Amino acid sequence: MSFIDPRTYIPSNSTESQILKFTFIVCVPICVILIVLLVLYIMRRNSNTNVDWSSLGGFVPTNNNLSTAELGLSKDIREMLPIVIYKESFTVNDTQCSVCLGDYQAEEKLQQMPSCGHTFHMECIDLWLTSHTTCPLCRLSLIPKPSVDLSHQSIEIVSSIENTNGGEASTQPDSQSATEAIIHIDDVEEGNRDSIEVVKESEENDRNSVGTSDGCCSCRLGEKA
């Protein structure tokens, strides 16, 4: 029979309590750190999503603004589009609505695009133009282009006319100088011809004078002999 020394005996309850204390000491700081990191992550995510649109110079997009905003033509402009009544003998290029792909029926009211002449169902084109400003078939814009500044155009035309007049004035002396140069060249050529003729005449005169001088010398020699 064995006896346990009471001095070295450690009850089991004390070991379990020590294990629990150790686990608590280790796990609690880890949990606190995880909670703090989670809170910081949530705060940072919220700060990124809640952008101050007013500081960026824009507006805060809300569901009401997006639902009521019209990206296309206004209702007043849509109501001003010409309305035509479709007939079988009516000369239209389209016999089918390009929006709903439905055929036109006799005596049916259609709306016509003033820029291209294409026709559509009134309900279809009205729904289309609430979010678009172009014809659904040819994509031609229904918004008129801004008028051209006529004063700016007139200034450009006047400046171009002045430039052309200046160019003509500058070309006239050039043409005149060219004609003068041609005349001068012709005069020089005529002068050269005259000088050549004068040289020829002088050479003939020299030859004649030499011949006469030779004849005189021969006559004088004959007299002396």
Curated annotation (Swiss-Prot):
Free-text function comment from the UniProt entry? E3 ubiquitin-protein ligase able to catalyze polyubiquitination with ubiquitin-conjugating enzyme E2 UBC8, UBC10, UBC11, and UBC34 in vitro.
Name this protein carries in UniProt: E3 ubiquitin-protein ligase ATL59
Pathway listed: Protein modification; protein ubiquitination
Q: Which SUPFAM superfamilies match?
A: RING/U-box (SSF57850)
Q: Which PANTHER family does the entry mention?
A: OS11G0150450 PROTEIN (PTHR47035:SF3)
Q: Which residues cross the membrane?
A: 22-42
- Principal localization reads membrane
Instruction: Provide the organism lineage as a comma list.
Output: Eukaryota, Viridiplantae, Streptophyta, Embryophyta, Tracheophyta
Q: Which gene encodes it?
A: ATL59
